[in-house]
Amino acid sequence: MGKIIAIANQKGGVGKTTTTINLAASLAAEGKHVLIVDADPQANSTSGYGIDPKQMTSSIYECLVDDYPVDGSQVPTCVEGLELLGSRIDLAGAEIELISRDNRESIMRRALATIKDKYDYILIDCSPSLGLITVNALTAADSVIIPVQAEYFALEGISKLLNTIRIIKSKLNRQLEIEGFLLTMYDARLRLANQIFEELKGHFGDMVFDSVIPRNIRLSEAPSHGLPALVYDPGSRGATSHIALAKELIMKHRRNYHAHGNVQPA
C-alpha cells in the first residue's frame, strides 16, 4: 500500500511546491510509482510540470466537489512513473461548496483511498492556508513533511502548524505523523543558515532530515520551463539534493518497515 505524504507549512514561500515537484521526480527516478496531488488553488505544482490547468478535463476540485473518480483524473508527466492530479483556481471556492457536506474533513481521504494501492508514494502539495482543503490533506495523509526556510523567522508559525497536526491526529487521523522537517533555501556560507539548521536539530532532533535543499538558480528556473530540476539540469545542486532527500526517505521507510517485522521494504 502506498504512503501519502502532505507537504505543508502555513508560512508562504518556504518551498512547499518546489519540494513536492522535485521530491516526486526523484522518488520516480529511484523506481517508485508516484502521484502528485496539487491541493493548492494557485496550481503551481500543475504548471510546474508544464500542464495548463485550463486544458484539464478534471482536477482535484471535481474529485472533491463533484465526486469525480481520482482514477482517470490524473495525468502523466515528463517523468516516467510520475503522474499528477492537477489543480485550478476553482479549488479556492471548494471550501464554501463543501461546508454543508457530512464528514467534510475526510472527503480527500475517501477519494485517495480508491487509488492508494496503485502508488508507492502520493505527495500532496498543500496551500499555505490552514483551511478545509489543507485539513482534508492532513486527514488523508499518513505523514507530513514540513519545509523550513533557512532564513530569519524560519521557525515562526511552526507551533501553529504543529498544534493543527495535534488536533487532526486526535480528532480525525490518529495515524498522522511528522515525517520530518526539511531545511530549504540553504546557503552553507551564511552563519545564519547554519544556526537555523542547528536550532531545528536542537528542537526536533532526528525529525530533521539530514538532506538540505540549497539555494540554486537552476532549481528556481526549472518550473518556468515546466520541468523538475532533475530533467532541466540533472547535475545541478537543486537536482542532486532532492535525489539525496528521496534516498533518505526511502531508506527511512525501509528501516521502519523492517523494524515492524516485515520482509520486503515498502
Where are these regions (language model features)?
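P-loop NTP-binding core
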Residues: 1-266
